[in-house]
C-alpha cells in the first residue's frame, strides 16, 4: 500500500515547510530599486564549471567571461541533484525534490504539487510581473520546463518572450539553452584540438575520451555565442540596464561520474549575477550556494516576501552562509538508486543505500549517449584502468564515502577507513542523517507501476537506438566503442 504525497509530507517533519514566523528577517546586502528592475534567468543545460572565467584556459568563452567580469561570480553553486527534471522542479519551487515528491527522473504519471507549494512564477504574476519562459528569440517560442509535477505552460507562463508584455510592465523571464546537453555539436569557428584537452584522472587518456571532451568544450562555446545574442537583444531593447541577470546551469557535466552522481562535476555549475548598476561587478564569492537558493534570492530582489515553507535561502543577504549543501540521487529513468550526500567547503560525505548495485548499473541514456562509458567498460574488462579509474566501474560500491575536497578535488581517495578522519566522518554522517529524517520522502519506495513504465520506455529507446545505428540488439561494449570511434574519430 502506497501513501499519498500529502500524508507522507505530514509524516515528515512538517516544521521544514513552515518556518517559525518570528525568525529574524534576513538583512539584504543589495537594496536595488526593485520596482524598476526586471529579472532574467539564463539557464544552460548540463553545464559544468568549464568556462574561461572558472579557470579553463582552453575553452573560448570570451562573452561569458565578460559577463562574469560584470557580475558577482559564485564558485560554489551546487544543484540539489545532478539530473534535469528534479533539479528544475527544485529551482522553480525553492524546495528539495525529496521533500515535495519530485525526486524521480522521469515520472510518467505526474502528480500535482502539494497544496501549500507553488512555483515562484505564481508569486511574480501576483506581484504584477509578466512571466515568460522561452528560447530568447522574439518568435515567442515556448521553451523547456521539464518539471516533475503536473504543470501546463499556460498555467505558469504568459508567453515565451518578454516583448509580449504591456508597455512598461516588469518581467520575470527565463531563457532555456539546450547546450551543452548531448549530443554535442562542433564549433567550426573555434575547434578544440583533442590532444590539448586536460582530462580528469578518473578518465582514461584515450583518443575517444579526448575527442568526446573536446566536443563538450566546443558545445560550451556555442552557449557563449547564444548568450551574447541575448545580451545584445536586451541592449537593443533598452533593457540591459534595467534587468538583473542570473546565469547558471540546471546541473553539471554530461559525463561519466558526473551527471546523475553526487561528485562535484555532476552538481557544481556556474552562477553569475549581473546587476544593472554594476554592484560588486567582477567580484568572486566562494560561499556555498544551493540552487534552491536562487528562487529565494530572486524573490528578494523583486521585493516579494519569500513563502515561509520555502527551503531555499536568500544567498544575497549578509547573514546567509550555508555550512552545508545537500545533494541526492534517486531513480534515473529506468535505473533505481538512492544516494544522499552532504558537502561542506572542505569535506564531502556520500551515503550509498544500494551497495549491492554497481555505480554503473545499466542506464540506457548513458550507455547509448556517452562514448566514454562503453570505452571504460571495455578497458575495465581488459584490465587497462588504473586505481583512479577502476573503482567507479567495479561491481562493488561502499556504503559510505568521505573526501577531503581541498587535498583531493577529484574525489578519488575515500577516507572512511582512515582513523584520523573518524570524527569528521561521524559528524557528517550525523548531519546527513538528521537532514534525511527531517526532509526526505525518498525513504518510501516508489510505486512499481511507475518503475515498470520507466523500464519499458527505456527498453523501447534501446531497441530504436541500436536499430538506427545498425547494431545488433545484443551489441557488446566492444561494438559500441567501435561505433563511437567510427563516428567521432574517423569522420
Show the residue positions of the predicted features:
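Formylglycine-dependent sulfatase
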Residues: 2-3, 22-400, 409-430, 444, ...
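Short, charged, surface-exposed hinge/linker loops at domain edges
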Residues: 445-458
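Bacterial N-terminal signal peptides
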Residues: 8-18
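Loop/helix patches that line or flank the sugar-binding groove of alpha-linked glycan CAZymes
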Residues: 430-434, 450-451
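A short N-terminal helical cap/helix-turn-helix that marks the beginning
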Residues: 436, 443-444
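Positively charged n-region of N-terminal signal peptides that target proteins for export
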Residues: 1-9
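C-terminal helical cap and adjacent loop that interface with cofactors, partners, or active-site loops
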Residues: 406
